[in-house]
């Protein structure tokens, strides 16, 4: 059996096991990311978002994004680039601009061409459109939807395809894992893009999950069979699927029992990817609980990743590795 997550995924016929990354000087984290048996893909956590790269119109800030791209390419890792068109972390000049259909499309095109052009040939995957759905499966309100209508989604894919035909183009969202109205909305988006005669290569399921009911999520992680059926239903549209931002949070503080329940939830998610041929990879949203976004966003919740604050492997690490090795 393979001794690391990336090695195990490769042995299982998958493409990668990855992590989100914010470059920082912490040797404990760096040592894990340097281990090619453990990690094989990097997603910049924030450095490639619109407000980070183009905070003012025509003013591009490439330093952090370049640094994160180099973190992947220097190690020979895949680079899941994230994200081009999203309502959040969008600079106010875009969100509050006085646009019409034509001028907003020009802004989208300029941004997509600049960003995808700079990293062309480095990004193995791109999250082209992120979080375009409400929980009921309708389209989320955004400047893009208000000005252009639902066509902004296929338009973004068309622009992305023109800017870098070599990368895999994804739609990415959260709460798609439950087989509900939002899942159906993601299927509608895939069909919409294809109806324009365009390519959509994959659907990313963020997989920000819980291992027990919490104040922010009533429904803990579903069964492996349920998760696999959801993945297969998406893959049946002719797209790859991936878990792109996996973390499984709990009400803190953690206990041994909670950590084991959490490990079981990880096994269900990871196992569902093993069960679906077109599930190409898994990315966790960070290495260690020390830097997880969860406690800051969901107070009283946490312990959501595979390594603890001291970079020790948790029960969730063991269950993840064992599940991949068992397939």
From Swiss-Prot:
One Gene Ontology biological process: xylan catabolic process
Presence of the UniProt keyword 4Fe-4S in the record: no
Glycosylated residue positions: 101
Temperature dependence: Optimum temperature is 40-50 degrees Celsius.
InterPro entries per record: GH10, GH10_dom, Glycoside_hydrolase_SF
A Pfam match: Glyco_hydro_10
Keyword Glycoprotein listed: yes
Top-level class of the enzyme under EC nomenclature: hydrolase
Catalytic activity: Endohydrolysis of (1->4)-beta-D-xylosidic linkages in xylans
Any GO molecular function: endo-1,4-beta-xylanase activity
Enzyme Commission identifier(s): 3.2.1.8
Activity's dependence on pH: Optimum pH is 6-8.
Disulfide pattern: 81-123, 273-279
One GO cellular component term: extracellular region
Residue ranges of every copy of the GH10 domain listed in the record: 1-323
Active site: 131, 245
Protein name: Endo-1,4-beta-xylanase A
Source organism per UniProt: Fusarium oxysporum f. sp. lycopersici (strain 4287 / CBS 123668 / FGSC 9935 / NRRL 34936)
């Amino acid at each position: 059996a393979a001794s690391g997550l990336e090695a195990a995924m490769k042995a299982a016929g998958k493409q990668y096991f990855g992590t989100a990354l914010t470059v920082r000087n912490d040797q404990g984290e760096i040592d894990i990311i340097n281990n090619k048996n453990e990690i094989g893909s990097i997603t910049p956590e924030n450095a490639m978002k619109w407000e980070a790269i183009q905070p003012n119109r025509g003013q591009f800030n490439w330093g952090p994004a370049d640094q994160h791209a180099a973190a992947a390419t220097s190690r020979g890792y895949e680079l899941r680039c994230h994200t081009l068109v999203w309502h959040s972390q969008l600079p106010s000049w875009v969100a509050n601009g006085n646009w019409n259909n034509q001028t907003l499309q020009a802004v989208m095109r300029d941004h997509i061409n600049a960003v995808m052009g700079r990293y062309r040939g480095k990004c193995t995957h791109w999250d082209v459109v992120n979080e375009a759905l409400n929980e009921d499966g309708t389209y989320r309100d955004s400047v893009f939807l208000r000005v252009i209508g639902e066509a902004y989604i296929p338009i973004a894919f068309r622009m992305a395809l023109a800017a870098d035909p070599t990368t895999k183009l994804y739609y990415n969202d959260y709460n798609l894992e439950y087989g509900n109205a939002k899942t159906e909305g993601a299927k509608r988006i895939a069909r919409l893009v294809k109806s324009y005669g365009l390519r959509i290569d994959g659907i990313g399921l963020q997989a920000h999950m819980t291992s027990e009911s919490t104040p922010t999520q009533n429904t803990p992680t579903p069964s492996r069979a349920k998760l696999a059926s959801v993945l297969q239903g998406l893959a049946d549209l002719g797209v790859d699927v991936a878990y792109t931002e996996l973390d499984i949070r709990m009400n803190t503080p953690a206990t041994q029992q909670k950590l084991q329940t959490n490990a079981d939830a990880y096994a269900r998610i990871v196992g569902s990817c093993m069960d679906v041929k077109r599930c190409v990879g898994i990315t966790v949203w960070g290495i260690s609980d020390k830097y997880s976004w969860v406690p800051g966003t969901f107070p009283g919740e946490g312990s959501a990743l595979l390594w603890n604050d001291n970079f020790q492997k948790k029960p969730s690490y063991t269950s993840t590795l064992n599940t991949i090795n068992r397939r």
